[in-house]
Regions:
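Extracellular loop and loop/strand-boundary signature of outer-membrane beta-barrel proteins
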Residues: 23-26, 61-68, 115-121, 152-157
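Residues that define the transmembrane beta-barrel architecture of outer-membrane proteins
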Residues: 14-16, 30-36, 67-75, 91, ...
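A mid-sequence interfacial segment
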Residues: 10-11, 100-139
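Predominantly the C-terminal beta-signal and adjacent terminal strand-loop region
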Residues: 57-59, 131-175
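Gram-negative (and chloroplast) outer-membrane scaffold detector with strong preference
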Residues: 39-114, 172-175
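Residue-level detection of beta-strand scaffold positions
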Residues: 21, 33-35, 41, 49-51, ...
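Short glycine/proline- and aromatic-enriched beta-strand/turn motifs that initiate or cap beta-hairpins
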Residues: 7-59, 167, 171-175
Length: 175
């Protein structure tokens, strides 16, 4: 007979998951600054994982008493390294790096503002990367809650390069 505990098999090489995530961009000072994304991830050795996904980010800039929106539509490919977990394999803390590419539009392509001012910012293709710190918590063997902090750096656009994101998500293990 064996003594001890048996744990569910989690984060095994080849396991894949589908993620839905969202949160705030540039802190929670404005609920108008947010993001939402969808991704597919797959585990490799030592609970590390690759990720491929898409994300929509909306950040508003104040001009007089109106908001001028900047929207980014990006695709992501990255790799996350697990550096901490509990013995029961319920909590995992990972750090990851991702390459990003996509399109940015300012004020949805409308160059004229309500007061006759003209925007100099242009719509553009953008590229860059992100560094992410992510906590995974297994609710069941197939449902995982996610919490993340992420810094994006995107070049090619007319506005700020860096964007900090705070978010939550859910991952469904599909095999």
């Amino acid at each position: 007979l064996f003594s001890g505990q048996a744990y569910a098999q989690r984060c095994l090489p080849g396991m894949k998951g589908v993620e839905l995530r969202g949160g705030f961009a540039e802190g929670s000072k404005s609920p108008l600054n947010h993001y939402a994304g969808f991704a597919v991830s797959g585990y490799t050795k030592k609970a590390n994982r690759w990720i491929v996904g898409a994300e929509y980010l909306l950040k508003n800039y104040e001009y007089r008493n109106v908001s001028v929106p900047r929207a980014q539509f990006t695709a992501e490919g990255g790799y996350y390294l697990k550096f901490l977990s509990d013995p029961s394999k319920t909590l995992f803390l990972s750090i990851g790096g991702s390459a990003l590419a996509g399109y940015e539009t300012v004020n949805w392509g409308n160059k004229m503002l309500y007061d006759g001012s003209k925007l100099l910012a242009k719509d553009a293709f953008i590229y860059g990367g992100a560094i992410t710190l992510e906590l995974e918590t297994y609710v069941t063997d197939r449902i995982v809650l996610l919490a993340s902090v992420r810094e994006r750096a995107m070049w090619g656009g007319s506005l700020s390069v860096f964007t900090m994101q705070f978010g939550l998500g859910v991952k469904f293990i599909i095999n």
